[in-house]
């Protein structure tokens, strides 16, 4: 059978192992073909091809449910659930998503883009199944990295206390970070664990003993204790942990041995209780470059399949904001040993890999544990250290209570750098950094800031580290503007002080962060129409520069706010609240992301759809305030 002929995963039923292995090869070919052209997550999906095929051969996916953690590794799932012909559109506007999405396919049983959610969701489905008297299977597939998340451990703790709730958790261990996957002892123990006579022997003996007159009622409890002791001796160390938490442990299993996987999954399904199947896979399996560099090939932009090298852009781009941040923080750490960089499993993405490489003693990676990262930093700051927590905007949402309870209320000097703030592009709604302005500006004591360019980023970083309270600095994804940066001598900013970038008499534009450049371009378009705009770089949303803004508002009486964040409770709302508190009642046009989910597309495509391009914003301003229009076409000077 050809992969292209698969429209339903149940078509895998009855196929031989050799046929499944052939389909596995086709999945990898298609996976590599598309990701090398359009970009996407590469290594995770390549590592779970056999796991996916074997698991799905043991399930009836018209009824059974599988929850994939994060979704990085779900490309093979998409290819065998009717999306082969659409796979070319992966992560493109109006194409299929890079993650699981319930609205995209009824086989996507639970949407995800953040880690550690799968076991909770699958357990919830299992409980609902049992309440309704149904009998389908519920499976969660989670990676060893995601298992470091507290939510996953909370779910395991809960599931282990529901011994009569059938649930299979597949632990996809692709980093050997939990236990060694090879060795005669592991192979032997796994073979013993999967042996039906041993698996059910103690249960059978226990049932027989119950029927012995007089003594039958007393022995089972002792037998139960003996059975538990034998299990603790027989199971590898990591397995014992799961057994103590109430799971039956199976593994570790070779995640690329389809025959063994099928036997293991069938054995797991027969047990009507929580089961942990530990599967060891190789991230990037089948593509040597991805196997050799599992971090670098976790996700890739377009690349040459033959050489494995990224295809360079036809037009050189400036250095990214993330890299400028990483370079600057490294220089600060070289001068101050109290400054500590903290990340939650995103060293390369946030730019902290430079610190990790050069001054590892001033670098901490807590794993996928955002809540812990925040409170860890809070504790460090109590005793004189200067923690800088670099984290994606979308992931910091997971630690909202810690931001309030452990940092804000105690007014602790912790610096947060929110990477990927604003529109992020092809990763879609689970990864858009559109909410941080709203959810952070309500927290007491926090200072919130965003730079207009790379040089201002450096000044804001040193400002944050020197400030005696909590700060949050948001930076956008991607390249900077090409503004020159400094190697040292960064001048701190005065907290809450904005700046006038351009004088004007007709309308006041107050822009925040990445939208300052867009405001300048918009003002140029308005100038072509005979409209003079005054531009303020707000720099801060908490506190706002009232001394600068209010006099200009009273003078111009027409106000526009611009932000790359949600309008609900965002920067524009902060300006309106400030004006209301000062009894200023004038029209305000708030420009930003409306109350919608921003789907996957390129950032430029998303901005156009949201009305955030300079020409669209110029038209909005003209229409809102009935400003005089000239007949000349709007063009950028």
From Swiss-Prot:
<comment type="pathway">
    <text>Metabolic intermediate biosynthesis; 1-deoxy-D-xylulose 5-phosphate biosynthesis; 1-deoxy-D-xylulose 5-phosphate from D-glyceraldehyde 3-phosphate and pyruvate: step 1/1.</text>
</comment>
<dbReference type="GO" id="GO:0005829">
    <property type="term" value="C:cytosol"/>
</dbReference>
<keyword id="KW-0479">Metal-binding</keyword>
<feature type="binding site">
    <location>
        <position position="287"/>
    </location>
    <ligand>
        <name>thiamine diphosphate</name>
    </ligand>
</feature>
<feature type="binding site">
    <location>
        <position position="174"/>
    </location>
    <ligand>
        <name>Mg(2+)</name>
    </ligand>
</feature>
<dbReference type="InterPro" id="IPR005477">
    <property type="entry name" value="Dxylulose-5-P_synthase"/>
</dbReference>
<dbReference type="InterPro" id="IPR009014">
    <property type="entry name" value="Transketo_C/PFOR_II"/>
</dbReference>
<keyword id="KW-0784">Thiamine biosynthesis</keyword>
<keyword id="KW-0786">Thiamine pyrophosphate</keyword>
<dbReference type="GO" id="GO:0016114">
    <property type="term" value="P:terpenoid biosynthetic process"/>
</dbReference>
<dbReference type="Pfam" id="PF02779">
    <property type="entry name" value="Transket_pyr"/>
</dbReference>
<comment type="similarity">
    <text>Belongs to the transketolase family. DXPS subfamily.</text>
</comment>
<dbReference type="GO" id="GO:0009228">
    <property type="term" value="P:thiamine biosynthetic process"/>
</dbReference>
<dbReference type="Pfam" id="PF02780">
    <property type="entry name" value="Transketolase_C"/>
</dbReference>
<dbReference type="GO" id="GO:0000287">
    <property type="term" value="F:magnesium ion binding"/>
</dbReference>
<feature type="binding site">
    <location>
        <position position="370"/>
    </location>
    <ligand>
        <name>thiamine diphosphate</name>
    </ligand>
</feature>
<comment type="function">
    <text>Catalyzes the acyloin condensation reaction between C atoms 2 and 3 of pyruvate and glyceraldehyde 3-phosphate to yield 1-deoxy-D-xylulose-5-phosphate (DXP).</text>
</comment>
<dbReference type="GO" id="GO:0008661">
    <property type="term" value="F:1-deoxy-D-xylulose-5-phosphate synthase activity"/>
</dbReference>
<dbReference type="InterPro" id="IPR005475">
    <property type="entry name" value="Transketolase-like_Pyr-bd"/>
</dbReference>
<feature type="binding site">
    <location>
        <position position="144"/>
    </location>
    <ligand>
        <name>Mg(2+)</name>
    </ligand>
</feature>
<dbReference type="InterPro" id="IPR029061">
    <property type="entry name" value="THDP-binding"/>
</dbReference>
<dbReference type="GO" id="GO:0052865">
    <property type="term" value="P:1-deoxy-D-xylulose 5-phosphate biosynthetic process"/>
</dbReference>
<feature type="binding site">
    <location>
        <position position="72"/>
    </location>
    <ligand>
        <name>thiamine diphosphate</name>
    </ligand>
</feature>
<dbReference type="InterPro" id="IPR020826">
    <property type="entry name" value="Transketolase_BS"/>
</dbReference>
<dbReference type="InterPro" id="IPR049557">
    <property type="entry name" value="Transketolase_CS"/>
</dbReference>
<keyword id="KW-0460">Magnesium</keyword>
<feature type="binding site">
    <location>
        <begin position="145"/>
        <end position="146"/>
    </location>
    <ligand>
        <name>thiamine diphosphate</name>
    </ligand>
</feature>
<dbReference type="GO" id="GO:0019288">
    <property type="term" value="P:isopentenyl diphosphate biosynthetic process, methylerythritol 4-phosphate pathway"/>
</dbReference>
<feature type="binding site">
    <location>
        <position position="174"/>
    </location>
    <ligand>
        <name>thiamine diphosphate</name>
    </ligand>
</feature>
<feature type="binding site">
    <location>
        <begin position="113"/>
        <end position="115"/>
    </location>
    <ligand>
        <name>thiamine diphosphate</name>
    </ligand>
</feature>
<dbReference type="GO" id="GO:0030976">
    <property type="term" value="F:thiamine pyrophosphate binding"/>
</dbReference>
<dbReference type="Pfam" id="PF13292">
    <property type="entry name" value="DXP_synthase_N"/>
</dbReference>
<comment type="subunit">
    <text>Homodimer.</text>
</comment>
<keyword id="KW-0808">Transferase</keyword>
<dbReference type="InterPro" id="IPR033248">
    <property type="entry name" value="Transketolase_C"/>
</dbReference>
<protein>
    <recommendedName>
        <fullName>1-deoxy-D-xylulose-5-phosphate synthase</fullName>
        <ecNumber>2.2.1.7</ecNumber>
    </recommendedName>
</protein>
<keyword id="KW-0414">Isoprene biosynthesis</keyword>
């Amino acid at each position: 059978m050809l992969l292209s002929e698969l429209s339903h995963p149940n078509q895998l039923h009855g196929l031989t192992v050799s046929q499944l292995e052939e389909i596995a090869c086709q999945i990898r070919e298609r996976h590599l073909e598309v990701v090398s052209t359009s970009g996407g997550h590469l290594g995770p999906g390549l590592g779970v091809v056999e796991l996916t095929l074997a698991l799905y051969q043991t399930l009836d996916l018209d009824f059974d449910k599988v929850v994939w953690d994060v979704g990085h590794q779900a490309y093979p799932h998409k290819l065998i659930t009717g999306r082969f012909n659409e796979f070319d559109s992966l992560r493109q506007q109006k194409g299929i998503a890079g993650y699981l999405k319930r609205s995209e396919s009824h086989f996507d049983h639970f949407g995800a883009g953040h880690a550690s959610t799968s076991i909770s969701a699958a357990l919830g489905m299992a409980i609902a199944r049992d309440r309704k008297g149904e009998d389908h299977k519920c499976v969660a597939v989670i990676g060893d990295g995601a298992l470091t998340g507290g939510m996953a451990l909370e779910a395991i703790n809960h599931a282990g206390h529901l011994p009569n709730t059938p649930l299979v958790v597949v632990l996809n261990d692709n980093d050997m970070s939990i236990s060694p996957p090879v060795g005669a002892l592991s192979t032997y123990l796994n073979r013993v664990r999967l042996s039906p006579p041993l698996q059910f022997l103690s249960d059978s003996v226990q049932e027989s003993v119950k029927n012995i007159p007089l003594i039958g009622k007393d022995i089972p409890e002792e037998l139960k204790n003996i059975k538990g002791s034998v299990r603790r001796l027989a199971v590898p160390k990591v397995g014992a942990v799961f057994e103590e938490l109430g799971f039956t442990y199976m593994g570790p299993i070779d995640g690329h041995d389809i025959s063994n996987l099928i036997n293991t999954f069938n054995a797991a399904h027969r047990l009507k209780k929580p089961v942990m199947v530990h599967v060891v896979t190789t991230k990037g399996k089948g593509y040597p470059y991805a196997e050799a560099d599992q971090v670098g090939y976790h996700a890739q932009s377009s690349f040459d399949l033959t050489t494995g090298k990224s295809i360079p852009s036809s037009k050189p781009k400036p250095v990214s904001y993330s890299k400028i941040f990483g370079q600057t923080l490294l220089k600060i750490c070289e001068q101050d040993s109290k400054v500590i960089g903290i990340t939650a499993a995103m060293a390369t993405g946030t730019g902290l890999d430079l610190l990790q490489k050069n001054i590892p003693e001033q670098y901490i990676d807590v794993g996928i544990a955002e809540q812990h990262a925040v409170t860890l930093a809070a504790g460090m700051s109590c005793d004189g250290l200067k923690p800088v927590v670099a984290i994606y905007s979308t992931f910091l949402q997971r630690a909202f209570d810690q931001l309030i309870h452990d940092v804000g209320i105690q007014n602790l000097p912790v610096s947060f750098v929110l990477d990927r703030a604003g529109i992020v592009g092809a990763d879609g709604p689970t990864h858009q950094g559109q909410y941080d302005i709203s959810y952070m500006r309500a927290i007491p004591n926090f200072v919130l800031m965003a730079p207009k360019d790379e040089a201002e980023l450096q000044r804001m970083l040193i400002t944050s580290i020197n400030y005696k309270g909590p700060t949050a600095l948001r930076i956008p994804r991607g390249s900077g503007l090409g503004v020159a940066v400094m190697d040292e001598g960064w001048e701190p900013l005065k907290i809450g002080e904005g700046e006038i970038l351009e004088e004007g008499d007709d309308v006041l534009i107050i822009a925040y962060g990445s939208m300052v450049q867009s405001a300048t371009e918009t003002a140029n378009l308005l100038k072509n129409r005979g409209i003079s705009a005054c531009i303020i770089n707000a720099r801060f949303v908490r506190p706002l520069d009232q001394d600068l803004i209010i006099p200009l508002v009273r003078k111009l009486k027409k106000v526009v706010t611009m932000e790359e964040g949600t309008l609900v409770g965002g920067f524009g709302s902060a300006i309106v609240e400030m004006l209301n508190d000062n009894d200023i009642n004038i029209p305000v046009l708030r420009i930003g992301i409306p109350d919608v989910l921003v789907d996957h597309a390129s950032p430029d495509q998303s901005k156009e759809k949201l009305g955030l391009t300079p020409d669209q914003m110029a038209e909005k301003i003209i229409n809102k305030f009935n400003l005089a229009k000239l007949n000349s076409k709007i063009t950028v000077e």
